[in-house]
Amino acid sequence: MDQDKYLPELVAEKESLDASFVHAMRLLAEEIEKFEGDELRKDGEVKKYLDIISNKNIKLSERVLIPVQQYPKFNFVGKLLGPRGNSMKRLQEETGAKMSILGKGSMRDKGKEEELRKSGEAKYAHLSNDLHVLIEVFAPPGEAYSRMSHALEEIKKFLVPDYNDEIRQEQLRELSYLNGSDDPSRGRSARGRGLRLTSTASPRGRGSAAPPAPPGRGAAAPRGTVSSRTSVPTPARGVSAPRTRGTAGTPGYRAPSLQATHKTYEDYGYDDGYDGEYDDQSYESYDDNYSNQSKSVSEYYEYGHGNNDENYNNYEEDWISSRPNLKAPASRLTRGGYRDHPYGRY
């Protein structure tokens, strides 16, 4: 049937009919409206009106072409599916649409694909078409078109022929995790004890400076160490300098800079008490100490940790004996204009 001649014939037939032919006039009017509104699809299916008042579910389907002809060496099917098909599953859950990879090259076994294509069955007819992604949505009109729009935007990201994009890197990490090569215990041991640094300091004793914290902004001093009475360690960038009670800086004296080395605490022969504490300290506690940059270094000192009462008393006596060498704090000056007592004496 010639579509160009069909519409003029319908109009001419409607004009020639008598008004008594009510049903014939109605059918001709409906047929003319279909062609005038250009609502006839290429496949012959007539487009119906969209009813949004009843909010009934409608079915939408779109076929997205995969650019295998422009990029024949790129594996689009593998990128769309992901490790064990997880990428496609997550994409369907996020968009609320059903997706299927159809067409020539959609099956891994090429021999079986060719056999099924030649079988002539209706369900394998798509193997004769180009490689594409079929997106289907079944929902109320407003939600259906919203899901379809979201699905088209997400599927577009997977059709970029890039081996180093964010989607590809995430799939490689997921694949390594599924294969068992990513062991969480290795990362914990590496960050827990293997990254602790110390300086070339003298053996541990009363009044010695605490080992410096690992490098980084906002790093805190290790727990269980005794602060120095003679010099204050240089704080890290972004951390306030710790101050001890009753001490004053010596004029003209600068504390020597401590250079960090890659030796661990075990190289200096620390006693078992300190080693046991670092062994028991878990990976989470280190993260809490290093992530809190707003606290000062002095808040992490624990004076007298691991020592008995006798050693603590000796340390207090030594500190009191060295007290006369320091200047006494100046007393607050009072104004002479005020009386000693607010009320008069009787």
Swiss-Prot record:
SUPFAM superfamilies, A to Z: Eukaryotic type KH-domain (KH-domain type I)
Region feature (Disordered): 175-291
Keyword annotations of the record: mRNA processing, Nucleus, RNA-binding, Transcription, Transcription regulation
Chief site of localization: nucleus
Localization in the cell: Nucleus
Domain of life: Eukaryota
Pfam families per the UniProt record, alphabetical: KH-I_KHDC4-BBP, Qua1, Sam68-YY
InterPro entries for the chain: BBP-like, KH_1_KHDC4/BBP-like, KH_dom, KH_dom_type_1_sf, Qua1_dom, Sam68-YY
Low complexity bias (residue ranges): 195-224
Keyword hit for Metal-binding: no
UniProt entry tagged with the keyword RNA-binding: yes
CC per GO annotation: nucleus
Residue spans of biased composition, Acidic residues class: 268-287
PROSITE patterns, sorted: KH_TYPE_1
Domain KH, residue spans: 65-131
GO biological process, one term: mRNA processing
Family: Belongs to the KHDRBS family.
PANTHER family per UniProt: KH DOMAIN-CONTAINING, RNA-BINDING, SIGNAL TRANSDUCTION-ASSOCIATED PROTEIN 2, RNA-BINDING PROTEIN RELATED
Function per UniProt: RNA-binding protein that plays a role in the regulation of alternative splicing.
Protein name stated in the entry: KH domain-containing, RNA-binding, signal transduction-associated protein 2
